[in-house]
Each structure stands twice: as structure tokens, then as C-alpha cells.
Amino acid sequence: MNTLNETAAADESLDTAFLSSPQCAAPQRFQKIKRKSRASPETERKKPKSTIGKQGENPSATEPRYGGNSNRFGLLAHLTADKQVGNEIGDLYDQPSTSHQAAIAAAKRDAASAGTTSSAKRAQSKPPPIVMEGVDDVYLMMQSIENIVDLEKIEARASMSGVLRLYAADANTFRTIVNWLEIEEYEFHCYQLKEDRPYRVCVKGLHHSTLHHQIKDELEKIGHKVLDIHTPLRRNEPGTSKASPVNMFFLNIAAAANNKEILAVKALCHMRVVIEPLRKRNAIVQCHRCQQIGHTAKYCRKAHICVKCAGEHPAKDCTRPRIELCTCYNCGGQHPANYKGCSKLQAFLQRSRPRSGVAGRTEVSDRPTPRGLAGGKEIPSSRGGISYADVARGSIHHKQPMSLTHQQQKQKQQPYDGSPSRQRSRSRTRASRGTLQRSTDASSSIEAILQTLNENINSLRSIQEKQMELMMMMMKQQQQQSHQQGQIINLLTALQARQAP
């Protein structure tokens, strides 16, 4: 009994020492102490043997029973207290220490900073290439560029056609190279950075007489910075001398996180409006400066090329008369450089179209086509409407078969030659190949017809050119005749003046 009391007192002292220690939340120390504290109830459960009712023993009347306590449930109270202490220790174990909380906070900050960095990298797109033509010495140019930027941030690539492309690693390097090339007066063209592209919208329902600064001021009040405003013009209609403006505005707004909020604007300048994102044009762009295809004049630093005569001057300075034929800079044909039917433009369009498959390729399978499936049609049932009762009665022979397809009728009319099914399928495959050969011959004949048409068109063009030359010659002859007539009239006038008294 004394041993039991000493054990309980030792357990209480251990619990008190554990709770007062600063490392109570450490996992390893807690596990060791927890095993020690859990060992005490097992010792307490070993109750001493009862001496009640035994002869020869005279227990003291003043000594309490049941472990030194008059209450028979005293030991259970100690066990309950021990469980409460264990729960408190478990709660302390669940709560991390101060150093552990600091480590978790630091890890969260690192993860947040890593996420921000990755999102910033995603937002910053790869710069477009800088395209140059006619570079004589790339090594000297790279040596000059090395003075302003690190060459590790530049990648150059030369094509077989003599075009040099410079690829910058980031936007700052791209802008630095472009500014340096402009200062050194190199001929090149580039493209707009993706991060500099504005958000373009179309404002419908606003009268064309609305002043641009009014639209700009109202949109800036609600947090949208307007970069440019354009009013489209309607094409010349019959009976009108000039194009008329449309009640519509195209707006370029600076890129921001709230760009799409402008679509919710329903009133502008005291008028009801509808704002929509501007639709993308699928047309191929052409530079109005150098007349080349694939870029715009805003980012072109090449020499000016005339759209009419292909000379090295702007179109506004061209002196070629309207009566003369134009010369295309791209293909050399007798049409303006911006003609939509230009062969160079059509070839560019053909290259830019996505390829869905190899044109002109027809697959021929050795596996025979099942009867009735040619052209994707289902096989009609020739014994449709037959029930089990009809078969049982034997009236199936009185049923009239449904109409056969044209192919089945043709096969039915052909006599069976005794050849196996594989041989018959091969014969059908040969027939399909013959059909393919006939279709190939038809396509070749169509190509020949188209070629003859092109030749006829070229001959007509040459005839028109000759007619134009004849007209020019006739005009010159008329001018000479009028000049001669004027000289004759002057001579007659002079003679009459001399003959007069």
C-alpha cells in the first residue's frame, strides 16, 4: 500500500516537471515522458489482496481501506486526473513551437514569392524577332552591339535567303537593340511586344460628331487610359463625292487588369452605347513603307518603296502618270504592289494556311468494302418484319423482300464465277483503283484546261498592252498634227498680213 502511494506521488511529480519544462512541445521528449506516464496506471491497477474475512488477521480499525482512502472509488479519481494530464500534454503537442511557426511562415513566404516570380515570368512573353536584310558583316555588328548589351542575351539566326534574325532574351534587351539599330540607321523591321499591345474595343451607338477628348476624359474618370481613338469611314457610295463617317469608334486602351470592365459601360457622353472587343482581322498585313508582306509600317525602318512604280521614294512623291501601267515591287507584274491578286501575296496566303492533311493523297485499302456500305450507307434488311411466329408457321417464304440497293441489284445480276470471296474482293479493289485512276486523269485534264485559260489570259493582257501602246502613239500623232496645224495657221496669218495693203 505504501508502494502504491509512492508511485502515485512520483507520477504527479513527473507530470508537474514535464508541464513546467520549456521543451514540453518537443516530439521526442514528449514520447519518452508519455511512455513513462502511461506506465503508472498499470501499476495502480494491481490492487493489493483483500484481507477481509480472513481468520488470524487483525487489521487496525483506524487504518482506512482501499488504498489509504475511505472512499472505495479513490483510485478511479486518480486515474481520471492522470487522463486529464495526458490530454493537456496532447494539446500541447498539437500546438507547434515558436520556432516551428516561424519556419512555416518563412516557407509560406518563399512559396508566395516563388509563385509571384513564376506568374511574372508567365506575364512577360518572349520578345519577337528583329529581321534584317543585306547585312554584310555580322561579326562587326555583334562587336558593336556588345558595347550596349550582353551577347549572352542575344541569339542570331541566318536563313538561306539572306535574312538575319536577332532574338533577344527579354524586353529590355529588345528595346535597347532596336534603339541602337535606329541610331546606326540599319534597315530592319520588327514587331510589337506582346506586353505593349493595347486592349482594343469598338464603341457602337455614339454619334460620329462626338469629340475625342470627351470620350477620353469620361473613360479616364472610371480608370481606363485611352491611347488612341479612330473613327471609321464608310466606303464611297454611288452618288457621293467622299466617304462619310460611321457612328462608331475604335479605341486603344492601355493594357491593365481592369480592361474587361469597360465592356460593362452602357452610357457614354450622355448616350447609350454598346462596347465590344474589336474583332481580329484575318487578312495578311502589308507594309505601306517597303511594300513587303508580313509586317506593318509602324515597326519598319527600311527604305521607302513606291506602291505604283516600285521606285525608292514614297508614293506621294511618285511622278508616274495615271495612264501608264503600274509595276509591282514584289512580283514585277503590271499592277500596284498592294493588289490582292498578286502572286507573291497568294503564295504567302497559301503558306500561312494551316495544313489539315496532305492534298491530293487518296488512300486505297486492300480490305474489301462490305456490300451496301459504299458511301457510308447502311445495309437495308432484305428480310425485315419477320417475327418468330412467322418462322414457326412457315410463312416466311410468302414475305416479299424489301427493295435492294443499286449495288446489290448489280451484284445479283452478275453470275457467280466460282471464284473465292478473297478473289472477288480483290477484283472490287482493282475496280476502285481504276476509278481512282480515272479521277486522276480527270484532275490532270482540269489542270490542262486551267493552264490554257491562264495562257489565254496572258495573251489578252499582252493584247491590252499593245492597244495601250497604240493609243499612246495615236495621242502623240494627234499632238504632232495639232502642232503642225498651229504652225500652218501662223504661216497663213503671216502671209495674209504681208499681202494686205
Swiss-Prot record:
Entry protein name: Nucleic-acid-binding protein from transposon X-element
Which gene is transcribed and translated to give this protein? ORF1
The answer on whether this UniProt entry bears the keyword Zinc-finger reads: yes
Q: Which residues form the signal peptide?
A: none
* The protein's role, per its UniProt record: Strongly basic protein that binds directly to retroviral RNA and may be involved in its packaging and in the reverse transcription process.
Q: Which GO terms describe its molecular function?
A: nucleic acid binding; zinc ion binding
Please state where this protein is localized. Answer: Virion
Zinc finger spans (CCHC-type) are 285-302
Q: Which PANTHER family match?
A: DOMAIN-CONTAINING PROTEIN, PUTATIVE-RELATED, ENDONUCLEASE_EXONUCLEASE_PHOSPHATASE DOMAIN-CONTAINING PROTEIN
Q: Which UniProt keywords apply?
A: Metal-binding, Transposable element, Virion, Zinc, Zinc-finger
Give the chief site where it resides.
Answer: virion
Q: Where is the composition biased (Polar residues)?
A: 434-443
Q: Where is the composition biased (Low complexity)?
A: 407-422
Region entry Disordered, spans: 20-71, 105-128, 353-385, 400-443
In the record, biological process GO terms are:
DNA transposition
